[in-house]
Amino acid sequence: MFIEQMFPFINESVRVHQLPEGGVLEIDYLRDNVSISDFEYLDLNKTAYELCMRMDGQKTAEQILAEQCAVYDESPEDHKDWYYDMLNMLQNKQVIQLGNRASRHTITTSGSNEFPMPLHATFELTHRCNLKCAHCYLESSPEALGTVSIEQFKKTADMLFDNGVLTCEITGGEIFVHPNANEILDYVCKKFKKVAVLTNGTLMRKESLELLKTYKQKIIVGISLDSVNSEVHDSFRGRKGSFAQTCKTIKLLSDHGIFVRVAMSVFEKNMWEIHDMAQKVRDLGAKAFSYNWVDDFGRGRDIVHPTKDAEQHRKFMEYEQHVIDEFKDLIPIIPYERKRAANCGAGWKSIVISPFGEVRPCALFPKEFSLGNIFHDSYESIFNSPLVHKLWQAQAPRFSEHCMKDKCPFSGYCGGCYLKGLNSNKYHRKNICSWAKNEQLEDVVQLI
């Protein structure tokens, strides 16, 4: 039987996450032992989404195409090549099956066509930390308040999963100061398909290590290391001995086959250490290394960015390129064309949840900025709000026709980050820029 006469239907192991413009296929969303390398999302544009939602086993592939084309007054003949290519791809990825006769199959869905719902969530388990880092955007410390209860955490995790979230990140503060850190770690690894664990690496205990080993096929552990010089790292992190303990943890986890990504916060004292840090990371056995300049949020506002000097910036860019060329197997670089999205998705595709239940678009947004409280407010009231719709529709400065780019002294700072665009308007400019005005974000600037 030719594919045209067969009856396509979405597999029961696939969930269609609906968005206002298209959707996402969540493959194997129920299987709890999917490895990081095997788990995947498939983005659907509006047409592909509408076609998939017709695939319930009751119509032939040919009938589905004809119905879809009739909606838009198009000829099936003009679309059949890419359509049947898509069907073959979906079949190869086990998203659909092709039946020989009509039979009704229910399509499992999450999300909404009316408003965006997130696919990824970051949980801040606590704002407490055993360190007091010089650049911390949350201004965490041993004295900081805020720790989510295990009961509230599980309730929230269940709600997020049921509404489409399949990947998550757990962070702090420092997650391992939470009294129920291991129970939470076990819960998220059973619940979600991909889990990132962010830690400073100074509080790793045997029980935590055993859990990470058990779930290593779906875990990425992110650990901060900021210098090859122990004194520089310890001073930056606010505790003597933290460098040695962090290096020990990186090696320990790596030796047990756990994927470790080391992150470096770059500032004036360590900016010429990136090469040596990459080598150090490789020697410790980690699989990935990333670095970012300290952002001017939280305590980071007090740290001066040294590359504001044009000549210094030029020299650093040359140095950086040499490092990337030498360690391209270790430093993940996203091709520019893959960055060309309207925005990063903060606030609608991914969210951050504080220990108090306050929802922020991303970790760098100030603690006072809230889209709503997920412990008390309904899902719809949070994500169907005018603010979330505004963030979903906003073009990041780099990709907005309203950004003056070449004429703006802040274009390099803002780049593809709409938070930095908001931040520059709130703290670095005398007047609201054309990007913020035309993207209708003037009121959001005042919330930062």
Swiss-Prot record:
Effect of residue 214 to A: In strain: ATCC 6633
Classification via SMART domains: Elp3
Induction: Transcription is highly induced by oxygen limitation and is under dual and independent control of Spo0A-AbrB and ResDE.
Cofactor section: [4Fe-4S] cluster
Compartment list: Cytoplasm
GO BP: bacteriocin biosynthetic process
Effect of residue 91 to L: In strain: ATCC 6633
Pfam families: PqqD, Radical_SAM, SPASM
E.C. number: 1.21.98.-
Annotated residues for binding of [4Fe-4S] cluster 2: 408, 414, 417
Keywords recorded for this protein, A-Z: 4Fe-4S, Antibiotic biosynthesis, Bacteriocin biosynthesis, Cytoplasm, Iron, Iron-sulfur, Metal-binding, Oxidoreductase, S-adenosyl-L-methionine
Residue ranges of every copy of the Radical SAM core domain listed in the record: 115-329
Membrane-spanning ranges: none
Keyword Ribosomal protein annotated: no
Effect seen on changing residue 96 to V: In strain: ATCC 6633
GO molecular function list: 4 iron, 4 sulfur cluster binding; metal ion binding; oxidoreductase activity
Cofactor comment: Binds 2 [4Fe-4S] clusters. One cluster is coordinated with 3 cysteines and an exchangeable S-adenosyl-L-methionine, the other is coordinated via 3 cysteines and maybe direct contact with the SboA precursor.
Binding site for [4Fe-4S] cluster 1: 129, 133, 136
InterPro entries xrefs: 4Fe4S-binding_SPASM_dom, Aldolase_TIM, Elp3/MiaA/NifB-like_rSAM, PQQD, PqqD_sf, Radical_SAM_PqqE_MftC-like, rSAM
Outcome of swapping residue 232 to I: In strain: ATCC 6633
GO cellular component annotations of the record: cytoplasm
Chain's role: Catalyzes the formation of 3 thioether bonds during production of the sactipeptide subtilosin from SboA. In vitro the thioether bonds cannot be made in the absence of the SboA propeptide, suggesting this is the first reaction in subtilosin maturation. In vitro, in the absence of a second substrate, cleaves S-adenosyl-L-methionine into Met and 5'-dA.
This protein's name: Antilisterial bacteriocin subtilosin biosynthesis protein AlbA
Gene source species: Bacillus subtilis (strain 168)
